[in-house]
């Protein structure tokens, strides 16, 4: 039997697509191997969001070639899309496919085996107008199922290469989204994470449909789903209609990831972001009024070209005032090919790092403050895996619906179920909890008693 091994770099979308590509290989009769093992085919799903992403991708490609010099080396993903010639120039690379036409991969492998000539299967992503259907009925290693709902982005922020790697925004057919959500729930997943390159932009390319309608339909039509999480949504996409759906639903979780990138209007303008801080504040206030206890996490880029200490403090103070529950903080790094990389006034690395540390310290403090509201409360978590960072045995880790990481003493069979846990000690990066009961057992018991 032919064997295949995968390595995925980068974001949730890439992980989702690797699972989809694995389905294609599985249907063709392949067996999956670990990337460290010898396989007939190696598929490397690459990332290009930073120059480091490119570098890491090249390292992994070379590792696969060393692993089995006779294997077929197939490179796909964002770096493959933006720099196919660069990848084809690596001796030992056999096939390059970008961020579309993934279903052609198996055909290319057969063709390569016959002709022994490297194949560049990358086409112009900017011409793609239709969402490429790739199904994932189950995941290899995760308790939360990702569900990709759209592709591409029309924003062209000055720091970002992604539209060139993923093309313009294309939304997935809503019926396909609902069908796959049902499939995932039927396969046993309790939580579905809606994901995409620009997730909240879903429906912007459709006439009479939008993201709020999709959320509403997922909420009412998918039987048995316990949690629906939005991986990321822009402030400009949080319409009053979206807020109404969130308010109505008891399945859409009390957590939103809203990338802010900067809290300074002048920096946002240089970044070519589509909102002002006044607008962002208005959306946050509206959300928190409709959804008490809402956890808001965010991404921040520190040290964007020209960022002054005053502009940085605008960001710092905005985040402090609006009590975000956690931040992902990134020092700005030049991405070759973007307008920001050519801007003057690049910020000194030491200044960047010092600002990053200040924001991370604020994030840790805010995360603890947010979690402390829930001390001694009983919350529902979905255990994901054994917790390895402790000497104590039988410790497991999972997330509440409002994205608090909780560690508690439990058993292996609780993984993937909904479990009630009392928060004993709030903290960061995780909270300490005490097992109360498994929710499914409670439901079964209730049904037994009432029958």
UniProtKB/Swiss-Prot annotation:
GO molecular function, one term: metal ion binding
Residues in TRAM domain copies: 372-437
Residues where [4Fe-4S] cluster 2 binds: 153, 157, 160
Listed cofactors: [4Fe-4S] cluster
Catalysis: reaction(s): N(6)-L-threonylcarbamoyladenosine(37) in tRNA + (sulfur carrier)-SH + AH2 + 2 S-adenosyl-L-methionine = 2-methylsulfanyl-N(6)-L-threonylcarbamoyladenosine(37) in tRNA + (sulfur carrier)-H + 5'-deoxyadenosine + L-methionine + A + S-adenosyl-L-homocysteine + 2 H(+)
PROSITE patterns: MTTASE_N, MTTASE_RADICAL, RADICAL_SAM, TRAM
Domain MTTase N-terminal: start-end pairs: 2-114
Residues annotated as domain Radical SAM core: 139-369
Binding site for [4Fe-4S] cluster 1: 11, 47, 78
Primary location group: cytoplasm
Subcellular location: Cytoplasm
Cellular component aspect of the GO annotation: cytoplasm
The enzyme's E.C. designation: 2.8.4.5
Cofactor: record remark: Binds 2 [4Fe-4S] clusters. One cluster is coordinated with 3 cysteines and an exchangeable S-adenosyl-L-methionine.
InterPro entries: Elp3/MiaA/NifB-like_rSAM, Methylthiotransferase, Methylthiotransferase_CS, Methylthiotransferase_N, Methylthiotransferase_N_sf, MiaB-like_bact, rSAM, rSAM_horseshoe
Protein keywords: 4Fe-4S, Cytoplasm, Iron, Iron-sulfur, Metal-binding, S-adenosyl-L-methionine, Transferase, tRNA processing
Gene3D superfamilies: Methylthiotransferase, N-terminal domain, tm_1862 like domain
GO BP, sorted A to Z: tRNA methylthiolation
Pfam families from the UniProt entry: Radical_SAM, TRAM, UPF0004
Cytoplasm listed as a keyword: yes
Biological function: Catalyzes the methylthiolation of N6-threonylcarbamoyladenosine (t(6)A), leading to the formation of 2-methylthio-N6-threonylcarbamoyladenosine (ms(2)t(6)A) at position 37 in tRNAs that read codons beginning with adenine.
Family stated for the protein in its record: Belongs to the methylthiotransferase family. MtaB subfamily.
Record-given protein name: Threonylcarbamoyladenosine tRNA methylthiotransferase MtaB
Gene that specifies this protein: mtaB
